[in-house]
Amino acid sequence: VPKTNEIRPLGKDDDRSGFSCGQPDLDRFFLHYAGQNQFKLHLAVTYVAVIEARIVGFATVAGSSIERARVPSARLRKRLPAYPLPALRVARLGVDTRVQGLGIGKALLRHVLALAVEQRDRIGCVGVVTDAKPEALSFYQGLGFVPVEGVREGLLHGEPFPMFLAIDTIASALEA
C-alpha cells in the first residue's frame, strides 16, 4: 500500500497534467483552476498528496460559514449565536484513479481536519462543511460527517449533499 510521502500546499510549478481522478469536472478544476484560485484570486488553497514526486490526490479548502439553523446538532445550535458561524469548506477532493481505495482521500481529509483545528485556534471555526457528490456520500458519512439541517428531504438526484462535521468531534478524533 503506497503511503503519501507528503501532503503540502500546491506549488506554482507542480505538474498537474498527469492527474486523473476519473471525474472530468474535478480533473478540469485541478488542471485549470486550482492554481488560479490559489495564486491569483486567493479564493482557496489546494493541498496535494505526493508519492515519489507525483501528485496522487488533492483537497481544496476555503474559508466558509454556516448558519446556526443549519447546524445538525440541536445541542450545539442552542450554544451558538444567531449570526453566520465560521467554518472550513472542503471545496474539492480527488484521488488519482491509479491509487484510489488506498487511504489517500482519508489522509487528505485528515490533513484538512487538522487545518480546521488550527483555524479554530487562530480565528475561530465551528466545523468543516462540504457539498458531497452522491457517489462520495458514504466516504464522508464514514468519517463522521452528517447532513446539515434542512436538506434531509427532497434533494434532486445527482445534486451535491451539504454535510457538516463539528469541530469538537474533529478535535476528539485527532487526539485519539
Where are these regions (language model features)?
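Conserved beta-hairpin
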Residues: 42-63
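Short amphipathic alpha-helix that is part of the acyltransferase structural core
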Residues: 1-40
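Conserved acyl-donor/pantetheine-binding loop and adjacent beta-alpha core of acyl/acetyltransferases
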Residues: 58-92, 155-158
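Extended hydrophobic secondary-structure segments that form protein cores and membrane-embedded regions
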Residues: 46-51, 90, 127-132
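A short, internal acetyl-CoA/4′-phosphopantetheine-binding micro-motif in the GNAT/acyltransferase core
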Residues: 91-101
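Conserved acetyl-CoA-binding loop-helix of GNAT-fold acetyltransferases
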Residues: 101-115
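Conserved active-site tyrosine of GNAT-family acetyltransferases
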Residues: 130, 140, 145
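C-terminal "cap" of GNAT-fold acetyltransferases
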Residues: 124-135, 149-176
